[in-house]
Amino acid sequence: MAHSIWHEKIKSFLPEHYYGRINHFLDEAYASGLVYPQRENVFKALQVTPLEETKVLILGQDPYHGPKQAQGLSFSVPEEISAPPSLINILKELADDIGPRDHHDLSTWASQGVLLLNACLTVPAGQANGHAGLIWEPFTDAVIKVLNEKDSPVVFILWGAYARKKKAFITNPKHHIIESPHPSPLSSYRGFFGSKPFSRTNAILEKEGMIGIDWLQ
């Protein structure tokens, strides 16, 4: 499922047998219709970014619900897939903030310690938020609580009202929060553009004596 250290820490914030409930939910969901991402990628964010290496969280809401888009990392799509509108705006802000990045696949961010987590880890094809409120929120809230317990600083990047509500779980004064409106076309001009989250994150990390993220990689 998830990286083993993640697994043990997350369990401490969940009711007993919650992992069993998740597996039952996944069995039923994938048996009853088309669900994104592919099942082997549901926990990809936790598999490719170990807890001990996580220094940034970018929280999304749920996976892309179009064909071949979702890959288990928030806002990221496979390289051969056209960038969805929110990712287009993220890359536009990145270009204005630091420089141009042509890649749509954000896996290189994940490998540098950026946890690309969605609050819901699955979605029915064509139904945005179709699995919201069913199983995932206690699990992904637990991920945030685990990060909150880290001794080393974490930068939490929270875009949009939904993500910003998760500030309630970030109580450790060692951590930092960068928040703005969501990069979606509906809200990007209300304060996402010009918010410079990438350079601000690196400034925080470097001030804390940590290596910044190569956002253009």
Curated annotation (Swiss-Prot):
Its chief place of residence is cytoplasm
Q: Which reaction does it catalyse?
A: Hydrolyzes single-stranded DNA or mismatched double-stranded DNA and polynucleotides, releasing free uracil
GO biological process terms, semicolon-separated: base-excision repair, AP site formation via deaminated base removal
Keyword terms, alphabetized: Cytoplasm, DNA damage, DNA repair, Hydrolase
Q: What is its EC number?
A: 3.2.2.27
List the subcellular locations. Cytoplasm
Q: Which Pfam families match?
A: UDG
One GO MF annotation is: uracil DNA N-glycosylase activity
Query: Looking at the UniProt record for this protein, which Gene Ontology cellular component terms does it annotate, in alphabetical order?
Result: cytoplasm
- Keyword Ribosomal protein present in the record's keywords: the answer is no
Entry-linked SUPFAM superfamilies: Uracil-DNA glycosylase-like
| Positions of the catalytic residues | 62 (proton acceptor)
Q: Which PANTHER family match?
A: URACIL-DNA GLYCOSYLASE (PTHR11264:SF0)
Assigned protein family: Belongs to the uracil-DNA glycosylase (UDG) superfamily. UNG family.
According to its UniProt entry, the function of this protein is described as:
Excises uracil residues from the DNA which can arise as a result of misincorporation of dUMP residues by DNA polymerase or due to deamination of cytosine.
Q: Please identify the protein, giving its name as recorded.
A: Uracil-DNA glycosylase
Point out the gene that encodes the protein: ung
